[in-house]
Amino acid sequence: MIKIAIDVMGGDFAPLEIVKGTLLALNKNKEIHVVLYGNQKLITPLIEKTPFFGNNQITIKHTPYFLRSADKNIRDQLKATPNASLFLALEAAKQDEVQGVVSAGATQTLVLASHLILKKMPLMQRIAIAPMFNSFDNRTRILLDAGANTELKPQHLHTFANYATIIAKEILEIPNPQIKLLNIGTEPTKGRALELETYQLLSQDSNLNFGGNEEPQNLLTTSADILLSDGFTANIALKTYEGTMLNFMNHFKTILTKNLIKKMATKTLFQKPLQQLKNQLDPRQIGGAMLLGLNKIVIKAHGSSQAYAFCQAILQAQKLIKAQVNQKIAHSLESAKNKETQSKQASTKNTAPKTSETTKESQQSL
């Protein structure tokens, strides 16, 4: 049984949609046990009126405290309200009471709280936000870093690329995932110093399937399985994608239901295709974004997540835990560190002066 902590009080539609989504996930997967952190007086009635028969899969940890999105100074909040639902969920993961955490709370709040409580994995220099998104070709892609770091070094992006490659192999079941660098042009000479140096690092790594640069207009049609950039750039790309998809679908629906005749025709002819299109492109359908680089699996569900989207986020966490992604990442980082150490030692050995041979030659000449 995989135990996952749920921040029931985080999100725009908490606790109703969070509880409904959790129960939906438990009905879909009997391997999950959830620990719900939040106000029991609100949680229990929601569980009781929702069809559900696996109560042995639920534990409720009562707390009346939760974090509001306006709360900015996490260190102060952690001292003032250590029993807030999010903090308790993360603390449970730290103490190995659960194997992962899912929250729809504010992104920066979750990132900072996770960093303070769970800490980064050994050898991991930065945390990254890595959402998945769908496209017209029914492929799921990974975008990172989508907002954890506005400024990064090439070495950080290189590490993220290796991390995302393992996730694409284990979760998306892509044997040899391709990585591309989000940039303003496809030529290797395009971009800032960050992109230029990262391009060189990725090109030289034989363990990565690097496909070069990718322009933003190809976000939905790229051959890449993983798109890489700093948190500022990737976050803008992600929000542009999300806003475009939601507005497109809403506007398209408005056109097709503008009058009674169109509404009847749409219901008769286009209802099923429209639902398929929504499932294909709606960013809320995919689940959540992974917080990469932490000692435990943490999933950031969309702030506006309703039941189905939150359910997907929980199932996503379960897959990552079951696949032992963190353990494989730790092994990959350790192997890379060992190779780097061996390379430096070999380089030092080759450049060291051959003292004994030099002395012998000097004595012979005398």
UniProtKB/Swiss-Prot annotation:
UniProt cross-references to Pfam families, sorted A to Z: FA_synthesis
Protein localization: Cytoplasm
Keyword presence, Manganese: no
Catalytic reaction list: a fatty acyl-[ACP] + phosphate = an acyl phosphate + holo-[ACP]
Gene Ontology terms for molecular function: phosphate:acyl-[acyl carrier protein] acyltransferase activity
Keyword Cytoplasm: yes
Function: Catalyzes the reversible formation of acyl-phosphate (acyl-PO(4)) from acyl-[acyl-carrier-protein] (acyl-ACP). This enzyme utilizes acyl-ACP as fatty acyl donor, but not acyl-CoA.
Protein's name in the database: Phosphate acyltransferase
Species for this entry: Onion yellows phytoplasma (strain OY-M)
